[in-house]
């Protein structure tokens, strides 16, 4: 049966439901979700109007979907695609990828999640080269978790949705991940979208803060993210940039996440979702302490395992996580043409 390709800007509810069916079928077959969190949020809530979709139909059945993001003028367009397992091995992946390349003028950065051999074969056979690897690392939560101490004067508490914490976190996150645009470009709207997700739990979103006037720094540096604005300090420590509205200044954070049964095809698993630390605090062990606080929280929730994502090139972070008991589990690969 002949396949046909249709291009879309926004998908309607029926099309979104069909795409989610394809995604879940692929997740069940492969043991890894084929689309990253950003694309899934775009599907559910909409996103940048410049992003688009390519749908591949075989007869009346949706056989494949591609998300195309043309918003990076420097690195060029990026994309992710998925083929329903029932339609694999029939040339539909190549057909869909060629349609995406036609849309982007032949230039594309393509993510393949889980290092799937079929995705690698397709990418290499169509002239792509591998440019980036993102490790997934895991650790048992049954193993001992080291104790930790916070630096002098630092207080640890949890995030309060709908409060000045939101803008303070966005500010620190942007500086923390200034060289990681996927994470550092998050806006207040991006944060609020995640607050609406079923997995969001402020009890697992830890903030480290100092009273205003304590310490020197007002610039942030980054930690680790999932599948990464202006100053993080505030002159008065109130609800200004970096201030949390209670006379304190945000200097670090650890946002944890719990994936349910459907997310990874197995029992629920925790995630070190995002960690960020003010560079004025570096060398004092704050990042390590924040990480361990999150691990202790996830274990207290009864979880058996925790995962995180880290760029293969970030050897310092990999060494830190290895010292905390994490080992490599899987890899996501980016290809470019």
Curated annotation (Swiss-Prot):
1D-myo-inositol 2-(L-cysteinylamino)-2-deoxy-alpha-D-glucopyranoside binds at residues 37, 182, 257, 271, 309. It is an enzyme of class 2 (transferase). Keywords: Acyltransferase, Repeat, Transferase. Monomer. The keyword Acyltransferase applies. This is Mycothiol acetyltransferase. Residues 210-246 are annotated as: Disordered. Acetyl-CoA 1 binds at residues 81-83. Acetyl-CoA 2 binds at residues 275-277, 282-288, 314-319. Residues 221-234 have a biased composition (Low complexity).
């Amino acid at each position: 049966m002949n396949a046909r390709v249709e291009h879309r800007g926004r998908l309607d509810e029926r099309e979104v439901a069909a795409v989610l069916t394809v995604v879940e079928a692929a997740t069940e077959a492969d043991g890894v979700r084929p689309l990253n969190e950003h694309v899934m949020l775009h599907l559910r809530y909409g996103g940048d109007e410049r992003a688009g979709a390519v749908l591949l139909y075989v007869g009346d059945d949706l056989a494949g979907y591609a998300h195309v993001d043309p918003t990076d003028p420097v690195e060029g367009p990026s994309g992710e695609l998925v083929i329903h397992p029932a339609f694999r091995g029939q040339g539909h992946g190549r057909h869909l990828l060629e349609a995406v390349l036609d849309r982007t003028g032949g230039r594309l950065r393509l993510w393949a999640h889980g290092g799937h051999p079929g995705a690698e074969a397709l990418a290499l056979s169509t002239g792509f080269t591998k440019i980036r690897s993102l490790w997934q690392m895991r650790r048992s939560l049954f193993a001992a978790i080291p104790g930790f101490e916070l630096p002098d004067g630092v207080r640890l508490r949890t995030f309060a949705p709908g409060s000045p914490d939101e803008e303070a976190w966005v500010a620190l996150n942007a500086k923390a991940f200034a060289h990681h645009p996927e994470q550092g470009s998050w806006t207040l709207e991006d944060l609020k979208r995640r607050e609406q997700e079923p997995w969001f739990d402020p009890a697992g979103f830890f903030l480290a803060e100092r009273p205003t006037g304590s310490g020197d720094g007002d610039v942030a540096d980054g930690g680790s993210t999932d599948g990464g604005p202006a100053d993080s300090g505030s002159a008065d420590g109130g609800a200004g940039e970096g201030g949390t509205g209670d006379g304190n200044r945000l200097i670090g954070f650890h946002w944890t996440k719990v994936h349910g049964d459907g997310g990874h095809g197995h029992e629920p698993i925790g995630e070190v979702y995002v960690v960020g630390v003010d560079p004025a605090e570096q060398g004092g062990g704050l990042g390590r302490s924040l990480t361990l606080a999150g691990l202790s929280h996830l274990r207290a929730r009864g979880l058996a395992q925790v995962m995180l994502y880290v760029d293969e090139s970030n050897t310092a972070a990999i060494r830190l996580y290895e010292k905390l008991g994490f080992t490599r589990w899987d890899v996501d690969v980016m290809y470019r043409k």
